[in-house]
């Protein structure tokens, strides 16, 4: 009877459940976020690019992460320079487009005024063109600048998305403890005793 009571009162350990790997769970969540349709705006597209970079970090092993970090760090400087160049081009094209439209409006209002229309028409006839021809040329130039600016903006958004992706990969890889090859080499060399790295030290008797 006493043995039965001791068996009933003895504590029992809870059943062991299989642990869910955190890396696989995070990878599944990121893959679902990347595959959840197309981004509605530019912010969501950049966010999906960051999710894609995070997915790559979890998939890659330590050596692959180290190599990708080095390549991404080298390419980031060039991509930032290209982004700034595209940004300046877009601004200049926008200013040119506004200038053409302002000239078209000014020329149109000038031709509508009876006091200055005759003077302007006579001045244009001396060079063999009319006010309508100048207006058409300026309008066509404004349309061309607008189309070219649209292509530049598209390229600019693509470069920005690549920058976000590479910066996210580098940041997450560093948080996971991955070091760049150059940093690792510097730390190993600094930890060696004096004269051991070069191999050219002289032995004293």
Curated annotation (Swiss-Prot):
Q: Where is this region: Disordered?
A: 177-205
**Where are the compositionally biased (Gly residues) regions?**
196-205
An example Pfam family from this entry, by short name, is Orbi_NS3
InterPro entries named among the record's database cross-references: Orbi_NS3
The free-text function statement in the UniProt record for this protein reads: May play a role in the release of virions from infected cells.
Instruction: Report the sequence similarity comment from the record.
Output: Belongs to the orbivirus NS3 family.
Which protein, by its recorded name, is this? Non-structural protein NS3
């Amino acid at each position: 009877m006493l043995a039965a009571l001791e068996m009933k009162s003895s504590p029992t350990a809870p059943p062991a459940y299989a642990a869910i790997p955190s890396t696989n769970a995070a990878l599944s969540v990121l893959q679902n976020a990347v595959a959840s349709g197309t981004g509605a705006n530019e912010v969501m597209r950049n966010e999906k690019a960051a999710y894609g970079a995070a997915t790559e970090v979890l998939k890659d092993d330590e050596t692959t992460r180290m190599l990708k970090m080095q390549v991404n760090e080298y390419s980031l400087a060039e991509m930032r320079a290209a982004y700034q160049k595209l940004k300046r081009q877009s601004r200049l094209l926008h200013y040119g487009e506004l200038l053409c439209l302002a000239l078209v409006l000014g020329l149109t209002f000038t031709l509508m005024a009876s006091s200055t229309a005759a003077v302007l028409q006579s001045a244009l006839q001396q060079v063999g063109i009319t006010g309508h021809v100048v207006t058409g040329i300026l309008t066509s130039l404004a349309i061309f600048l607008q189309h070219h600016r649209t292509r530049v903006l598209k390229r600019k958004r693509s470069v920005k998305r690549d920058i976000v992706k590479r910066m996210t990969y580098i940041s997450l890889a560093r948080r996971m403890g991955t070091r760049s090859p150059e940093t690792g080499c510097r730390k190993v060399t600094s930890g060696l005793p004096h004269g051991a790295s070069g191999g050219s030290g002289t032995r004293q008797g």
